[in-house]
Structures are given as C-alpha cells and as structure tokens.
UniProtKB/Swiss-Prot annotation:
One of its GO terms (molecular function) is ATP binding. CDD domains: NMNAT_Archaea. Pathway: Cofactor biosynthesis; NAD(+) biosynthesis; NAD(+) from nicotinamide D-ribonucleotide: step 1/1. It comes from Methanothrix thermoacetophila (strain DSM 6194 / JCM 14653 / NBRC 101360 / PT) (Methanosaeta thermophila). HAMAP family: NMN_adenylyltr. GO terms for biological process: NAD biosynthetic process. Belongs to the archaeal NMN adenylyltransferase family. It holds the Pfam family CTP_transf_like. Transmembrane segments: none annotated. This is Nicotinamide-nucleotide adenylyltransferase. Its main location: cytoplasm.
Amino acid sequence: MRRGFYIGRFQPYHMGHHLVLEQISREVDEIIVGIGTAQISHTVTDPFTAGERIAMIYGALRELGRWFYIIPLPDINRNAVWVSHVKSMTPPFEVVYSNNPLVVELFMEAGMEVRRPPMYRREVYSGTVIRRLMIEGGDWRQLVPDAVAKVIDEIKGVERLRNISKKDFA
C-alpha cells in the first residue's frame, strides 16, 4: 500500500489541482489531500472555510476511483517543525507531491521522497485568476470541476467573495 500526500489552499479547488490528482492517482493506492491554511476564511485571498473546501474536493475526487483522505491543516507558523505537525495530523504516507519551494524543501530536509507533478495551464488554473473572475462576473465555472461549482453555488460563494472584496468607505 502506497500513500501520497498533496497539499494546497484550494481557494477554490480547480482543474489544475484535479489534473494533478488524476496523475497522482495513477502512482499511489491512496491519496491524502491536505487543506493548508485551514483556519482562514472569509477573506479575498481565502474566501472558503475548511469545511467548504472539503465538500468541494470530496465531490470532485469521488470519480477518481482511489481511496482518499481530506485533512484540514491549520498553519502553525513554525517551518522547522511543520513536517512533524503535518505527519501528526495525517495517516502515514511515503511520497509528497508539491511544486511549492518551501514545501519541497521542508519535506526533503525531513528525508521524504518528493515529486514535482506537472503544472497544467497555470496562467488560468489559478485560484487568484478564478477569484478575480468571480468578483468581476467573468466565466470561472469552466476552470473548476462541476462538483466545485455546485458547492460554490450552494454556499453563495461568489456573493460572499464580492461582498468581502468591497472597499470600506465609512
């Protein structure tokens, strides 16, 4: 049994994440998805709660045919012990998938196998781009799995993002 670990903020989970996880699913038996910065929500850069992100990811991943875990991981702001923190919050895993330089460095320093998955259309499959499209009324739905769009609709996520992005003129 081989488990892989993949972490992201998933604000929101998008097709770039999904394509990476499809690739990972061909290499491991089980996938652990870590939801980073799990304690932050209702901001322009992190509009969705950990629970909302779990629902998005769960709906999108059901079709992969692999066992997966979705684990919220709050920030601890102590890089020297972060890998130990992650390991204490997740089932054991053998390989880490990431392109984030800090994540790669920390897991490599801890002696873990780290793989850098290909990135897919990063110029459009980007949480920053998708959130901007939501705020501006652009076509963001084509950039996320259908299950994610459904969750965002159910929680009125676009309305929330537009409201919190307004300037305070008081």
